């Protein structure tokens, strides 16, 4: 949601001169995962029922607005307006319903696996950025390892490992944001 991006920027700015500065893409992923873990996130299924959507927004948005205004001292706009968010995301929910785009992901994938259909999971980033196994605190908010495919899709871990798992490894580490970069060269070697 729009307030996730705003909060991401606010928090990164607040941490910019500290050891807590992890550097982000600014897309609001961290605050979104905070809401998921806090069980206050708005999920795709919530968009399909206007009453549920409004209830979720009325619960979460005032907390986010208070954080931005009272903790960080900022003025907030439509990104923190329950009515504006409700209208925008209710329309998204209507479109999702009309076009049949929402499915139970675990069930959808299990049907394909049981039907011998090939299933391909694609991830990004890597172990060094994994929230549990990466170079903390310079990590993303998710699990971008092969095990994360099971966590994020609803299929069992045996499904991911039962077929073939192909890992792609770069010859060097790269990253978005700040944090250690073990393969980084300094001095004259860095100028090649």
Predicted features, each with a name:
Residues 1-192:
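Non-transmembrane, aqueous-exposed alpha-helical and coiled segments at domain scale
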């Amino acid at each position: 949601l729009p307030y996730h991006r705003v909060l991401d920027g606010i928090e990164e700015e607040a941490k910019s001169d500290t050891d807590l500065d992890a550097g982000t893409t600014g897309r609001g992923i961290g605050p979104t995962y905070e809401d998921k873990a806090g069980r206050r996130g708005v999920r795709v299924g919530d968009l399909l029922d206007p009453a549920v959507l409004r209830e979720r927004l009325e619960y979460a948005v005032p907390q986010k607005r208070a954080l931005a205004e009272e903790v960080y001292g900022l003025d907030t706009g439509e990104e923190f307006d329950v009515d504006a968010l409700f209208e925008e995301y209710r329309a998204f929910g209507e479109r999702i319903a009309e076009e049949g785009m929402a499915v139970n992901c675990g069930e959808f994938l299990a049907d394909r696996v049981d039907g011998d259909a090939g299933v391909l999971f694609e991830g990004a980033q890597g172990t060094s950025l994994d929230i549990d196994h990466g170079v903390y605190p310079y990590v993303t908010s998710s699990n971008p390892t092969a095990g994360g495919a099971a966590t994020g899709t609803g299929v069992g871990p045996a499904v991911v490992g039962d077929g073939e798992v192909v890992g792609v490894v770069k010859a060097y580490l790269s990253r978005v944001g700040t944090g250690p970069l073990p393969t980084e060269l300094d001095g004259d070697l860095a100028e090649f």
